[in-house]
Swiss-Prot record:
It holds the Pfam family CinA_KH. HAMAP family: CinA_B (MF_00226_B). This is Putative competence-damage inducible protein. It comes from Bacillus velezensis (strain DSM 23117 / BGSC 10A6 / LMG 26770 / FZB42) (Bacillus amyloliquefaciens subsp. plantarum). SMART domains: MoCF_biosynth. NCBIfam families: cinA_nterm (TIGR00200), molyb_syn (TIGR00177), PncC_domain (TIGR00199), PRK00549.1 (NF001813). Belongs to the CinA family.
Length: 416
């Protein structure tokens, strides 16, 4: 089939039109399609109404040769996407045995009774390629009709994303007749803003052809997605490594990992590799740092314990902060952060103690504006306190502080 040059994404679900959820699926699919040279020209959202969906399909067929639908594949009466598309294409829905077995196994495993309407989820458009759903029950499908491709994907992002990456994208490339190997890698950076990163890499980004470079900033981090394509897979890898090396030569000090990793995952890995234990004293972060660390498997190997020390009494009587420190410098201070880190390290017997004290907002505290944060680190022969002024919501400030905590310990371990 000739490569599709015009793609359209149709998100189905009244909850989108009511503003109850954001259409993050369209953003994800557009980014993935751009990497394989397919241009998305239209995003459409339509409610759970078959007549309006038919109208949207007719419009899409006039201007697009790849039409991707997300949502409406569930078991309820308002999940009408595949029924409407099957009717439009003049094809029946047939039971997919593999999908039905998967649904039966799910209910047997969870010891729940399967409802008759769950069978509906195993129905697929006759003649379509079935996209397995390893994270849910409703399979996706890719149907070819005339000069167009119709792709149906589930609505939940936790199901749609792996299905697209592992099932739909490879099949789509095959359908489009591309023999190029497309490989992507994501470089993750922390401690540098998107504008500064792009300024440092301006000439490299401006000159991009193959690989392409796509920057993205989110939650205080910056990522660069590098995507290379070539008929020879080894050449694709070489192109990626060459560009990665040029990037890291300039901003390598802010780089911390690849692809789907995170700061806390890298921290956990580094601590376990070095046989280091850590502990935390958290005031305004309220246990967020310790929650992140203990969410990961193997946390008992590295996390000695944590104290949520919101009150001055706990700071003083549990962690040993001096009364005069609290009286003279206050709880939100460099001095308090230093004593908290040392206190929790001593209390738990860990190799490294980290503390978080600050103002999450929205109101000021002790004369400090929201976003004023002190992070203390205590290790054998080394004590340091870092001061920050963050902006954003209460939740955003707390998350930013916890991320910087991971970052600072990683930097300390790198220096050993």
């Amino acid at each position: 089939m000739e490569i599709a040059k015009k793609a359209e994404i149709i998100a189905v679900g009244s909850e989108l039109l009511l503003g109850q959820i954001a259409n993050t699926n369209a953003q994800f699919i557009s980014k993935e399609l751009a990497e394989i040279g397919v241009n998305v020209f239209y995003h459409t959202a339509v409610g759970d109404n078959p007549e309006r969906l038919k109208q949207v399909i007719r419009i899409a067929e006039e201007r697009s040769d790849l039409i991707i639908f997300s949502g409406g594949l569930g078991p309820t009466k308002d999940d009408l996407t595949k029924e409407t598309i099957a009717n439009t294409l003049g094809r029946p829905l047939v039971l997919n045995d593999e999908a039905f077995r998967s649904i039966e196994e799910y209910f047997a495993k969870t010891k729940r009774t399967m409802s008759p309407n769950n069978r509906k989820q195993a129905l697929v458009i006759e003649g379509s390629d079935v996209l397995a759903n390893h994270f849910g029950m409703a399979p996706g499908m890719l149907a070819e009709h005339g000069s167009r491709l119709y792709m149906l994907l589930p609505g939940p992002p936790s199901e749609l994303r792996p299905m697209f990456e592992n099932e739909a994208k490879p099949l789509l490339l095959k359908k489009l007749g591309s023999n190029e190997k497309i490989v992507s890698t994501v470089l993750r950076f922390f401690g540098i803003g998107e504008s500064q990163l792009e300024a440092d890499l301006e000439d490299i980004i401006d000159a991009q052809t193959n690989p392409t470079i796509a920057p993205l900033a989110a939650d205080g981090e910056v990522t660069l997605r590098l995507t290379a394509k070539h008929a020879d897979e080894k050449e694709t890898e070489r192109l990626l490594k060459e560009t990665e090396a040029a990037i890291l030569e300039r901003v390598g000090e802010f780089f911390y990992g690849y692809d789907d990793t995170s700061l806390v995952k890298e921290l956990s890995k580094a601590c376990r590799q070095n046989g280091i234990t850590i502990s935390s004293a958290e005031s305004f972060t309220g246990g967020l740092f310790s929650e992140w660390v203990t969410d990961l498997s193997g946390a008992s190997q590295l996390f000695a314990g944590g104290v949520v020390c919101y009150s001055d009494s706990v700071k003083q009587h549990v962690l040993g902060v001096k009364a005069e420190t609290l009286a003279e410098s206050g709880a939100v201070s460099k001095e308090c952060a230093k004593e908290l880190a040392a206190g929790v390290r001593k209390l738990t017997g860990s190799d490294i103690g980290i503390s978080f004290t600050g103002v999450a907002g929205p109101d000021p505290q002790e004369g400090h504006a929201p976003g004023r944060v002190f992070i203390g680190i205590s290790a054998e022969g080394k004590e340091e306190v870092h001061e920050f002024n963050f902006a954003g919501s209460r939740t955003g400030i707390r998350k930013r502080a916890a991320k910087y905590g991971c970052h600072l310990i990683l930097k300390m371990l790198d220096q050993k």
